[in-house]
């Protein structure tokens, strides 16, 4: 591809992911809190539910959610926010998760250990006669099972509390497809949409998040063979480079190539289930 081709695709992706050219953290806080409040009221439901991992994304989305239900209550609408801890056994960075909960200050906190359910599903697959090709493949699939079990737990609580499940996907993760389809990607509302990673961090900082939360190394921590593996190691590019791409800045050719490869390979993750009416005929 030529430089002009790269730039053209970059502009199209930025528009698709709704990344604004201008950014003001305080304005984004006000806009997103209002969005969350208006949406919950419009549904007639009463509760927001979100899993808190300890990272900056869930911490930021959680604090925005809590502020939105407080705004609703001040306006006379009964609303609550439930923050869920969803460890797989003992979480390696549990101290970070507890720090995040203290920052979010949710109306209610629940802890559900997903390990028994995730391990049971893996065991059931083995009992069926299914065999994985390698231990690494099994570990990867098991990691996605954990992510989906976490969403099962959140929807169970939402179903019992007249609730809506919040997701933490933002423009950088959406660009790279770095989420589990129907796991952490399977939510009802995405208050961080349109923000790249550095802007999520700026919002967290403006909300009063301490630097240990704001600058925590992002990790999905789903694979037991590679615990706490940083997202950037999986990407092969840094969040700064991804964020530059999303802000329309020029990046190195290898960054363009890597970002576009991830974006194209994960297109199906950003789409609703396909039907024959969606599939191109040409």
Curated annotation (Swiss-Prot):
It comes from the Bacteria. Its EC number is 6.3.1.5. CDD domains: NAD_synthase. InterPro entries: NAD/GMP_synthase (IPR022310), NAD_synthase (IPR003694), NH(3)-dep_NAD(+)_synth (IPR022926), Rossmann-like_a/b/a_fold (IPR014729). Keywords: ATP-binding, Ligase, Magnesium, Metal-binding, NAD, Nucleotide-binding. Mg(2+) binds at residues 57, 173. Pathway: Cofactor biosynthesis; NAD(+) biosynthesis; NAD(+) from deamido-NAD(+) (ammonia route): step 1/1. GO terms for molecular function: ATP binding; glutaminase activity; metal ion binding; NAD+ synthase (glutamine-hydrolyzing) activity; NAD+ synthase activity. Disulfide bonds: none annotated. GO terms for biological process: NAD biosynthetic process. ATP binds at residues 51-58, 168, 197, 219. GO terms for cellular component: cytoplasm. Deamido-NAD(+) binds at residues 148, 181, 188, 268-269. It catalyses: deamido-NAD(+) + NH4(+) + ATP = AMP + diphosphate + NAD(+) + H(+). It is an enzyme of class 6 (ligase). HAMAP family: NadE_ammonia_dep. Homodimer. PANTHER family: NH 3 /GLUTAMINE-DEPENDENT NAD + SYNTHETASE (PTHR23090), NH(3)-DEPENDENT NAD(+) SYNTHETASE (PTHR23090:SF7). Catalyzes the ATP-dependent amidation of deamido-NAD to form NAD. Uses ammonia as a nitrogen source. Belongs to the NAD synthetase family. This is NH(3)-dependent NAD(+) synthetase. It comes from Burkholderia lata (strain ATCC 17760 / DSM 23089 / LMG 22485 / NCIMB 9086 / R18194 / 383).
């Amino acid at each position: 591809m030529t430089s002009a081709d790269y730039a053209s695709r970059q502009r199209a992706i930025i528009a698709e992911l709704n990344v604004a050219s201008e950014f003001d953290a305080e304005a984004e806080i006000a806009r997103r809190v209002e969005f969350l409040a208006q949406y919950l009221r419009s549904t007639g439901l009463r509760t927001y539910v979100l899993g808190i991992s300890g990272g900056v994304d869930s911490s930021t989305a959680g604090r925005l959610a809590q502020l939105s239900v407080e705004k609703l209550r001040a306006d006379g609408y009964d609303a609550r926010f439930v923050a869920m801890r969803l460890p797989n056994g003992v979480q390696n960075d549990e101290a970070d998760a507890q720090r995040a909960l203290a920052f979010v200050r949710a109306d209610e906190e629940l802890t559900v250990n997903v390990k028994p359910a995730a391990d049971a599903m893996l065991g059931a697959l083995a009992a069926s006669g299914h065999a994985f090709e390698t231990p690494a493949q099994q570990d990867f699939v098991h990691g996605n099972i954990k992510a989906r079990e976490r969403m099962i737990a959140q929807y169970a609580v939402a179903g019992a509390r007249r609730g809506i499940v919040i997701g933490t996907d933002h423009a950088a993760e959406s660009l790279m497809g770095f989420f589990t389809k129907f796991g952490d990607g399977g939510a009802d509302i995405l208050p961080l949409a349109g923000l790249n990673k550095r802007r999520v961090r700026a919002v967290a900082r403006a909300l009063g998040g301490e630097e240990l939360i704001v600058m925590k190394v992002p990790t999905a921590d789903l694979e037991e063979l590679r615990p706490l593996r940083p997202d950037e190691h999986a990407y092969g590019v840094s969040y700064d480079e991804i964020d530059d791409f999303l802000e329309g800045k020029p990046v190195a050719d290898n960054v363009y190539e890597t970002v576009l490869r991830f974006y194209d390979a994960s297109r199906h993750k950003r789409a609703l289930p396909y039907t024959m009416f969606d599939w191109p005929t040409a």
